[in-house]
Amino acid sequence: MTGIKKINLISAVLVSLSLCGGCTLEKAGNSSQDQTVQEDNETEQVKAEKAEKAEKEEINEIHLRDKDSLYENDDDTSVVTMYLTVSKGNSSENTYHTWKEINSYSVYDYEDMGVERYQVAGLLQVGDENGPTQGEVGYGESVPNATVQIRGQTSSQNAQKNYKIELKKNKGTWRGQRTINLNKHMTEGMRFRNKLAYDLIRGIPQMVGLRTQFVHLYVKDNTEESGVKFEDYGIYTQVEQLNKTALKSHGLDSNGQLYKINSFEFYRYEDIIKKEDDAGYDKTAFEKMLEIKGDSDHTKLIDMLTDLNDYSIGIEDVLKEHFDEENIVYWMAFQILMGNVDTQNRNVYLYSPLNSDIW
């Protein structure tokens, strides 16, 4: 396979010369010969300054980098207090359910029932331990501004659920985010390792992380009766949702390809991994493996998988042609050092800028 050729930008600067000249003839009497007075020609040389131009970068050779300024005001150990009031919504939004129902089923139960995950209407308010505070999302409101459902895969079987709170359009954002993911990490003894991992990633230029925040959650359940008080649900870890909004926030290409790996071993899967206009394309089957979070043109993905599964092509050539090798090496080393075994075929994203061939 041919390697990636670097294109050099050559700048040509034209040098021009401008000449100024004049001759004056003066006649002095009959006895003297004509005297020619020639003024000195002044030659003005126009100097051309050569501009220092940065070498044009070939997009396939640009390494993945995060936006450091995004984390400047982060306080790793701070705790934000959130108040969530849940109520029954309506059938059209799939929110006509009780809070008890939300906390009774795992994603596998929903698959067995053949239905979408239940949701409830929610009013999210942010404040301190005394209550919602002015200037924060939801302050002074009394009607729902969000929907709430469980999140996660195997963790959805735990007694303590993780929640996905989706703020409605035109209802504001929290730190520029409309999707608020709250993770309990019930089976993780320390409960803070996930946040610690993201905090450590911030110090590694070759990797891109996500913003995180400890959250103290209070929930008021109005789905079955009114007049109840807020119940203390303890500490959660909020993790930024990686989507087009997050790509833009992190200085990445929001128009690029982005896939969330749900269950995928990087085989070709020709009967499932197809382009949208191919016969037999099934988006539901596709997203059981790879959830589409960015551009829906799958050509680049298919090209990469085809070469990766062609054993006549050396793995070194495949990596060079299709992947940011620096990012992969650092990512793998980090997972090994952290003892993370849950990102082999899931819980990871594939990203590629729009006009790049590199993942």
Question: Predicted segments — roles?
Answer:
Residues 114, 159, 187-195, 292-299, ...:
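Soluble non-cytosolic domains of exported or imported proteins
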Residues 2-10:
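Bacterial N-terminal signal peptides that target proteins for export
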Residues 151, 220, 351-355:
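Short beta-strand micro-motifs enriched in acidic
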